[in-house]
Amino acid sequence: MKDHLQFYIDGAWVPASGGRTLEVVNPATEEAYARIALGETADVDKAIAAAKRAFERFSRTSRKERVELLESVIEVYKKRYDDIAEAISDEMGAPMSFARQAQAAAGLGHLSEVLRVLRDYEFDEIINETVVTREPVGVCGFITPWNWPLNQIGCKVGPALAAGCTMVLKPSEIAPISAIVFTEVMHEAGVPAGVYNMVNGDGPTVGQALASPP
């Protein structure tokens, strides 16, 4: 059984603040094959604080910088494609062919489409005599489900990066391994510290902390 007992906060893998853990079960074999740490409110607070700090700089990046960043994420995603598919197969109990051809492909498809749109997206628009400027809104909190995990992550993380937002992700605690691999992708791709953060945990604790008013 492999342990994944750290969270990704402010550009680094850090230990969980508490001692709670959860076994990850492959539904096809009904056997536990990995173990994750379950986060606490303190972990979420650290991740949000890191995202807020990073927003001050990342929100001012140019379209060119964000295009280059997304290109890097996609390049590393393709390099880790088989690892992502294997993680999805194990955590969902899905056939490897389905994990490769559909599940992992969905995440890549979202990132690629976001990149395509970003290249020509008009952040400033003239309406009559008014200039409307679309600006990054701030820190995004993402809570994603177990089904189609990389599809759900890709369609949230990609647009946030393109818009210049920073983020904290809480993947499903019953299908978290593909999110961990994706986080490794983000790190290797050179996403600036604090722009993307990931905290594993359950809904009543991590989910509630992430969804509560600031």
PLM regions and their residue ranges:
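Terminal low-complexity tails and localization/encapsulation signals of metabolic enzymes
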Residues: 1-35, 68, 72, 122-143
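N-terminal alpha-helical segment of soluble enzymes
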Residues: 25-92, 118
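Short alpha-helical
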Residues: 42, 79, 83, 94, ...
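Long amphipathic alpha-helix in the N-terminal Rossmann-like dinucleotide-binding domain
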Residues: 71-81, 94-121
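Short linear capping/connector segments at secondary-structure termini
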Residues: 87-95, 102, 125-129
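Rossmann-like NAD(P) dinucleotide-binding subdomain of oxidoreductase/dehydrogenase enzymes
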Residues: 123-214
